[in-house]
């Protein structure tokens, strides 16, 4: 633990097209090898597809999808008397949103479709309909926390 004051995270600039911090966060997560322009093309293309499929504003749909896969509880390992316990803890808001975006992008990459635009748009649509890998991960994390509810008194 640092002895000095905690470092405040830098605020994320909103993306230029939609003016949304969430879209900027997704762009940064999609970006590989510093190629932000191609990441923007992918995310904006996926948002256009989502908007045309749903007939709603794409940023609103993305926010709803992220909200659907945002975890409430997670487990953290805690060592007590030589045994490791999986202790359920509430997820801080910033970490919860980061995890949701990470899961959406990671499971979009793992899909078998062709092209990242298709993968990302379909993963967002699946998350919106409470399906897909990202929603399954959220459900698994929540189930794990519920299964270990007996160790909640080890919370720190």
Identify the role of each PLM range:
Residues 1-33, 37-40, 44-156:
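Strongly charged
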